[in-house]
Every structure is written in C-alpha cells, then in structure tokens.
Design a protein with these regions (language model features):
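Phosphate-binding/switch region of NTP-binding enzymes
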Residues: 30-32, 36, 40-41, 72, ...
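Gly/Ala-rich phosphate-binding loop of Rossmann-like dinucleotide-binding domains
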Residues: 51
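Walker A/P-loop-proximal flanking segment of P-loop NTPase domains
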Residues: 22
Length: 190
C-alpha cells in the first residue's frame, strides 16, 4: 500500500522502534568482517543486551526494550557455545543471567544444512521467531545454498531475510565474512 503523503505531512508519526541505536526492528542488518575477528562474540554480546537488559549490556548498546532473541550459530559446535556462555556469564549480574536464560534461544545449527530459501524453513522461522525482538544468523553462508558471487542470488536471499523481519517484527542481524582476497588486500569494505 502506498504511503498517504498528506497524512505523513500533517500527522506526527509514531516513534521509530530501535532494537539498539541505529538498528530498527523489522529490518535486516549485517556485521561484516574477516574471519577470526570476533564477529560471533560481538553478536552474542549484542544478543545478551537485548535478551537481558541493562545488567547484560556488555557492549553499551543500550537497547530501548528487552525481548526474546533467537541466535542460530552455524560455525561453532555446542561445546564452544557453552564455553562462550560460561565466560560471558561471569560478567553479568545474577538478575541479568536469569533474563538472558529466559529470553535467549541459542541454537547450534552447525552441520544441519539449513536452506533459508526453502518455503518450509521460512514458515518454521516465522512461526518460531514470531515473538522475537532480534534474530541472529551466524553466519550467512551457513543458512543457504546459493552462489554468494551472484548479485541475483544474494538479492533473493536478502529479500527472504527482509520478509522474515517484516513478518515477525524482529530485527535480523546476519554475520558475514569478507572474501579472502579483499581481506588480504586490506579492502574489507568489499
């Protein structure tokens, strides 16, 4: 449906719903960096902040509202994830630990061959994440079977992520590696 331009001119819009500064609910964002630079730890800490609130905000991202977080970890096995949780848990207060334990779903999906382009997978994600504030996919390459060098394939993939974000109202954060050539040549913005 088209925007009513006159209404937009005349009526005060509702406040924007930021999950954390600069990241709107219902949108898709990316954390892109070379491998082994801490993307997963950073994303997990952001998930802690949203799930646990002030006492779990190790990054200082100050989420406006807490909420449920679904984190799909495709590159690390369960024992590594448990080690990270144990380590981070020492840095948050007991009440925040309870909030994180209640509101964070950390799903190890390494080796599960997820294909987010599959309609049944999309439907399951929309249903399972309907009450989420944040959804994290770590990493993008582990949730599809498309050609990452194809602009068309990647546009379709981002379209699916946008659909899930719009349908659930959650912000979606995906982690992605820059290609090896770009990282080697110092062109990490590629």
């Amino acid at each position: 449906m088209a925007i009513n331009i006159m209404a937009a001119f005349e009526e005060t819009p509702p406040p924007l719903d930021f999950v954390f500064n600069g990241f709107l609910a219902g949108t898709v964002g990316a954390l892109v960096a070379p491998g082994a630079t801490g993307k997963s730890f950073l994303a997990l800490e952001a998930a802690f902040a949203v799930a646990g609130g002030v006492g779990a905000d190790l990054l200082g991202v100050t989420p406006k509202h807490t909420g449920k977080v679904a984190y799909f970890a495709g590159e690390d096995p369960e024992n590594v994830l448990i080690t990270r949780l144990h380590s981070l848990g020492h840095h948050i207060d007991p009440a925040a630990r309870e909030n994180v334990a209640h509101s964070l779903i950390l799903e190890p999906v390494m080796g599960n061959r997820i294909n987010i382009m599959d309609e049944a997978t999309i439907a399951a994600l929309v249903k399972g994440c309907a009450d989420c504030r944040l959804i994290v996919f770590d990493t993008l390459s582990r949730i599809h079977q498309l050609d990452e060098n194809s602009n068309g394939d990647m546009a379709r993939l981002v379209g699916v992520l946008e659909y899930i974000a719009k349908t659930t109202g959650a912000a979606i954060l995906y982690l992605h590696h820059v290609n090896k050539g770009s990282a080697r040549d110092g062109q990490t913005d590629q």
